[in-house]
Amino acid sequence: MGTSSAHSAAFHQSQIPNPQSQPLSTTTRSCNRLGILARMSAVLRTLTAPAARQIHRWVLGAFPRGQSTIDYDQPLGDPGIFGPDSVTWRVHSEFPGMLSGGLCALMLQLLHPRALAGVYDQSNFRADLIGRLRRTTNFVAGTTYAPRAEAEQLIARVRSIHSHIHGHTADGMPYDANDPQLLTWVHVTEAYGFLQGCRRYCRDVPAHIADRYYDEARRVAEALGAADVPASEAQVDAYFATVRGQLRMDTRSREVLDILTSIQLPVPAAGLSRGVFLGAGTALLPGWASDMLGRTTTQRAQAHASARLLRSLSPLFRTALRDGLSARACRRMQLPQTMLLEWPGAQ
């Protein structure tokens, strides 16, 4: 891939031209930037090491490794579905944005009666909500960072599982987990949550980068069978406006929300952690969704306080998780992890 090769060559070149004798090339400027970012990251790691170690243990307690058989290290040079030049690799590398955004997506999804019915009727979410969250996390991570063959196997496995999930809602409406429109709903809520989480808690996201993210992310949705998937921020806004008439908050929605908001992660300070991430997730909700969920003024104020706290902690998560799957994918491509700190095409 062109940009990846340029990054790799720039990072490994041993001779940097004298800026007084000739103009800096694009690859040289990229090398200089990555070098500065690497040094800044090293200083930050030193200063924040004790707190970062605690966060590292917290994350591994909530989402332990070893639950997936995917080899993220081989084969060398395999970019997977998205590759290192993608916005997706960068957005999905931000743990605070992904976890809060994923919770935001779940709260949006429970407002759709047909999307909720399959989960409500044909899953064990009541007894194993943590397991369900972990499996979803593994799917998103795998389709983002795994080699292409592994990612495609994940998609095929989910399609096979979906083929057995169908029935009728409490009101008699038919549902099918492979329904292209339901797949689009689930995808859009997730992509919206992840992007907003990244934007609010981790880094600035310019409008053209947001559009590129939505355009990239629909590859997985379409591979699963989704149809008419929005490909830009404006299209996502229009999609939400169109689908809102199908949404409602009912008894089932309330039950699922109560279970979600009482989840107990097997980590230290579980209640505090849950409060921060759930609050930060609800702070990402569109106003109309907060209204439908019946969020009170006090709850909204608490959510904004959680949002401010998570934003302040975001650099620590980045330091703590420098050995995560995004780093392994970068090594597979023989590229420095620091390249993920810049949006593609940054000069």
Question: What do these predicted regions represent?
Answer:
Residues 1-3, 9-26, 347:
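Short, basic, low-complexity termini and linkers enriched in Ser/Thr/Gly/Pro
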Residues 33-185, 189-347:
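Mature, function-bearing regions of proteins
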